[in-house]
C-alpha cells in the first residue's frame, strides 16, 4: 500500500539542530512526522552522514521522495537510485554565500589580509571595487544572488558557464570554452560552481598563469575546483595578487599546510553558509 504523501520521516537524528528545524518545517507545512517504515518521503537531516543512507533507506517500504539538505550532492552520488524522486537544497543558500563573496571581494581589494596581519603601521594599499572587472564561474543561484548585490558597484561582470543562456544581471555570459580568454582580462575570478568530473581542477597552473598578476582568486564552490599545489606556487611567486578561500582541498585544511603561511591567502572555514544562516532558509523552503 502506498503511504499518504504527507507522511514524512526526518532522519537521521545525528544533528539535533538540523533535525529539529526540518521536522518543524514539515509540521508547519501540513506534514506528519512518522518512522521511515511508514513514510512516503524522507527529509535527510545530516549532510555529513551520507554513509548512513543505505541502512536508513533499507527500512523504508513506501518512500518515493528523498530531500537532501544541501545544494552539493557529491557525497550522495553513489546512493542515487532512479526509483526515488530526489530534490536538494540548490539555491536555498545563495543569499548568504553571495554575501560571503561580497565580503571577500572587499577584503581582497582593500588589502585586509595584509592589514590584519600587520604588527606595525603598514604602507597604504588597496583599490576600489567600483567598476572592477569580475569573472564568475558558474551561473546558478549563488551567481544570480551575487549579481544583485554587486549591482551598485557598476562592475563589468562575465559569467562563465556550460550553456550560453544569459544570466540576468551579468554584463555578458560566455561558455566554458572561452574561459582562457576571460582570465587575462579580469581583476578577480570567483568560483561558484558545482563540483563535477568536468569542473574538478578547472583552475590549474596554466590557468593561474593566464590570470593577471594583480588579480584575485575567490573560491566559494568546492576545494577540488583548484589544484592546491598549483595555487600555492602561484601565490608564492606572486603570479596572482592573492586568494580568498572558503573551501580547500583537502578540507579541513591541515595545520601546517603551506596555504596557512602565505600572506596573500585568506582562508575562512567553509562559512559561506553556516547552520545558523542556512537552517531557517531550508526550513522555509
Language model regions located:
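Redox-cofactor binding/interface segments in oxidoreductases and associated redox assembly factors
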Residues: 42-45, 68, 190-191, 219, ...
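NAD(P)-binding Rossmann-fold cofactor-contacting core
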Residues: 152-169
Amino acid at each position: 500500500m502506498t503511504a499518504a504523501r504527507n507522511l514524512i520521516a526526518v532522519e537521521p537524528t545525528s544533528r539535533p539542530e538540523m533535525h529539529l528545524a526540518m521536522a518543524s518545517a514539515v509540521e508547519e507545512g501540513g506534514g506528519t512526522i512518522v518512522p521511515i517504515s511508514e513514510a512516503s518521503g524522507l527529509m535527510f537531516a545530516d549532510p555529513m552522514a551520507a554513509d548512513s543512507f543505505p541502512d536508513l533507506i533499507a527500512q523504508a517500504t513506501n518512500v518515493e521522495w528523498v530531500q537532501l539538505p544541501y545544494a552539493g550532492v557529491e557525497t550522495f552520488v553513489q546512493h542515487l537510485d532512479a526509483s526515488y524522486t530526489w530534490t536538494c537544497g540548490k539555491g536555498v543558500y545563495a543569499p548568504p554565500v553571495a554575501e560571503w563573496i561580497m565580503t571577500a571581494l572587499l577584503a581582497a581589494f582593500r588589502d585586509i589580509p595584509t592589514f590584519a596581519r600587520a604588527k606595525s603601521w603598514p604602507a597604504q594599499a588597496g583599490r576600489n571595487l567600483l567598476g572592477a572587472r569580475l569573472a564568475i564561474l558558474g551561473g546558478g543561484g549563488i551567481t544570480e544572488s551575487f549579481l544583485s548585490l554587486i549591482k551598485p558597484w557598476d562592475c563589468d561582470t562575465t559569467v562563465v558557464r556550460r550553456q550560453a543562456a544569459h544570466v540576468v544581471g551579468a554584463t555578458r555570459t560566455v561558455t566554458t570554452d572561452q574561459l582562457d580568454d576571460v582570465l587575462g582580462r579580469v581583476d578577480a575570478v570567483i568560483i561558484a560552481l558545482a563540483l563535477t568530473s568536468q569542473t574538478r581542477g578547472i583552475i590549474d597552473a596554466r590557468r593561474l598563469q593566464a590570470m593577471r598578476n594583480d588579480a584575485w582568486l575567490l573560491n566559494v564552490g568546492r576545494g577540488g575546483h583548484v589544484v592546491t599545489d598549483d595555487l600555492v606556487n602561484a601565490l608564492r611567486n606572486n603570479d596572482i595578487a592573492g586568494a580568498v578561500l572558503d573551501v580547500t582541498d583537502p578540507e579541513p585544511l591541515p595545520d601546517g599546510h603551506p596555504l596557512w603561511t602565505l600572506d596573500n591567502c585568506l582562508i575562512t572555514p567553509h562559512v559561506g553558509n553556516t547552520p545558523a544562516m542556512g537552517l531557517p532558509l531550508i526550513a522555509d523552503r
